[in-house]
Amino acid sequence: MAKSLLLVLCFALVTTLGWGYSAPPTGTTEPPDVQTVAPTEDETLQNEADNQENVLSQLLGDYDKVKAVSEGSDCQCKCVVRPLGRDACQRVNAGTSRKEDFYTVETITSGPSCKCACVAPPSALNPCEGDFRLQKLREADSRDLKLSTIIDMLEGAFYGLDLLKLHSVTTKLVGRVDKLEEEISKNLTKENEQIREDVEEIRTEMNKRGKENCSNNILDSIPDIRSALQRDAAAAYTHPEYEERFLQEETVSQQIKSIKLLQTRPLAPPEVVKPQRPLQRQVHLRGRPASRPTVIRGITYYKAKDPEEENDIEEHQDEFFSGEHGMDLLIEDQLLRHNQLLTSATRRPAATGRSAAVTADAGTTSAGTPTTALPSARLPASTAAPSTPDPAVSASVEQFSTPLPTTSVSPDPTEEAVPTPFTQVPATTVAHTATQQPPASAPPSAAPEDAFVEATHTAPVPPPPVRTDSPGKDSTARQGTVPPGPTLSPEEEDDIRNVIGRCKDTLSTITGPITQNTYGRNEGAWMKDPLAKDERIYVTNYYYGNTLVEFRNLENFKQGRWSNSYKLPYSWIGTGHVVYNGAFYYNRAFTRNIIKYDLKQRYVAAWAMLHDVAYEEATPWRWQGHSDVDFAVDENGLWLIYPALDDEGFSQEVIVLSKLNAVDLSTQKETTWRTGLRRNLYGNCFVICGVLYAVDSHNQRNANISYAFDTHTNTQIVPRLLFENEYSYTTQIDYNPKDRLLYAWDNGHQVTYHVIFAY
């Protein structure tokens, strides 16, 4: 064994010496006086990058080639090799060889004192050499071969491996890897230095800003909120001293003091409760002549809600002033006035059966004259008792059977005067149960002076039914308590349309995009709540995740200063989510479920499954151009767009448009349409005024709105409206009916489009 290893080492030494003393290659050589310009480092790296695919082929290109080793001066060697074919070696192994089944290596030498040797690995001459030796080794036990024979076979195997060449190749590869590591280390050092500089700049900027954190800005913005709310006399919802129980007691005390100026008959004094906090709101009263007595039976107050609580569905118990005095505040000048309607600037026309005053049971007065309505003041139909009736109060109300005359109230100077005789309100209109219905929304800003609002305290009365007025809607009185979940009646849907606006008719043009910000990854979505009074912006970065980020306004969004974040209990998929009426609607990742997440209470408010959705079980982890389940909002409310199988046709996948109940996420067959749009054949889609629009491409700069489906007429057209994807990678398009804008996420850029209607 030692002898064999010694032979291998000697042969390697001879081969190395032979290569070292080999004659230089013939041909032209470069003159020594010509200076070559060394390539720069950038050129070397560029050449390495260009030739990176040929590195291994260059290193291993002559691995199986025959090499000539020469020794001596002026020596020329030539090797002529005739290898054995694969079929020939198989015939040799099978014992059916032919005369031509052999290989030769011929050496041709020229020149004095020249020694040449042709070196060829067995793999280049006999392709079956390795298989032959392996077969012999396997048969060694049965043939009882000697150890020397096995050593010879191993030597041949090592020789066939060409270890010297492998060592050379390995050395070159190691050298290249070392060079790569050195370059990477330099680049990492530069990047680390740049990162340190950036971190220092960020720290310096943060130190300069100081207390400009979003959490501290909440306290700084309270004076702005107060100044904005001073335009509305009843909107004092941001201060704890204006809680409803204190407001009622203090206001009642003020009004009772003002009534002392009037000559009234002795009344049972009400239960006096000392105000726990000083009253900051002044109730403006106008003095009345002492010779005209006034009867006060009940007082109704309105309390606006916090913008964060405007969509909260909580039923507060009514805290009326006790009605045992038999008084009713009918003086127009002493009512709390509002500066704007509750819903929108456009006021709905009043119905013929409505009037400014509530219709009472007695249709005629004591003098036989029909009852007329007051233009500005409202007469409550009854003194609504608390939800838990007090026995003493009930007894006093039942004993009170004599109708009390009331004084007529002069109308507002801005309105037409209507002669109003004294009216009688029978005591039978008193109800012992009352329900409180929350106002539709908080007043956004100033409004006409003649408009005022009452909290809708409805009281069930025998026929004729009592109607209570709330700005922008008519609602009949109902008995019992309101269910905890909100129900969208047609009147309330009209209120929503009044808040976010009504349809402007046919879509005519979509203007070019306006880039608002650059934020986040290539895929994502940003949106605003069309029913909110503030300008908050919500962002979902990427098409998969579970964190919703909130910004107070667009300016904070541009600065990257988020004000809140919501960790969702279930992840979303896609970019088709929306924020509507204080809730986040999205499709749970890798499921058929849609979820409504209440942003104020931070819990899942509703959950539903789309049974007919054409869901791909093996959804690939890549963006496919649009979301499978897409929510949309327009002037009519909440919509849902998703693919489903067309049962009536040839079981093709079609896009379904369905009106979604925002409360329980339910859909109705009457408001569900199967469109002619096909899956994966469009870019993004959105809904405007009950019409579904689809863009033909999401990654072409100049695209078109190539499809429109009208839910009013059940017709579909090809509008061919131009739509520009400025950054050629739009992953979200959503319509906001409040702003009349399209919000889009285009390759990490947040852009908006103005919507222009034909009329």
From Swiss-Prot:
Pfam families found in the cross-reference section: OLF
UniProt signal peptide: 1-20
Chain positions carrying an annotated carbohydrate: N187, N213, N704
Classification via InterPro entries: Olfac-like_dom, Olfactomedin-like_domain
GO CC list: extracellular space
Post-translational note: O-glycosylated and N-glycosylated.
Transmembrane feature ranges: none
Region (Disordered): 346-396, 456-494
Highest rank taxon of the organism: Eukaryota
Disulfide pairings: C503-C689
Coiled coil spans: 40-68, 179-209
Olfactomedin-like domain: residues covered: 502-759
GO BP term, pick one: signal transduction
Quaternary state and interactors: Homodimer. Binds to heparin and chondroitin sulfate E.
Record's protein name: Olfactomedin-like protein 2B
Originating gene: OLFML2B
